[in-house]
Amino acid sequence: LAPLAHAVRVAAPLGLALLLPKPPGLFHQRPPQASVGVWILLLGAAATFTAHGMEALEHYGRFVDLIIGSADRWIGWDVSQAQAETALTIIGVHDILLAALLLMRRWRWIAGWMALWGFATALSRVSAMGGDSWHQAAARMANGAVPLALYLAWWQVVRSPASKTSP
């Protein structure tokens, strides 16, 4: 699952490079909803969320530690391993459902929720282990940035005068 879990790290630079505006006349500019860059971002986000969802359903040890550490550090709760594993089961279903909805429906609000969730889970390293683990959070910022880029690309389509439907 590791290659899929890191799909956004490959998709982010490639998809964003293809999504950026081109100088006039250099290339035919396709609308964002049909661009190759959007598809790369879409597949990268879906792959990452699916892989993380599967790891959560398997009660991956590091994820258990993140839940227990964050609960203790921020709200003073003593979360047991069984409680953390129950939460991971819910989170796993949540992540896989989000990935499926993103691929099947391409709703803008799903990409927005995935962005918030991706940033929150990236920052969970700092919330569980303290500021010294900022580099782990930074390495995972694409988990929220890629869905945010999708949200913004689809939002641009909706706001453009030629657009009549919402992606």
Predicted regions and their residues:
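Perimembrane loop-to-helix junctions flanking transmembrane segments
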Residues: 67-79
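Membrane-interface loops
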Residues: 61-67
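Extended, low-polarity transmembrane helix blocks
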Residues: 1-61, 81-93, 103-167
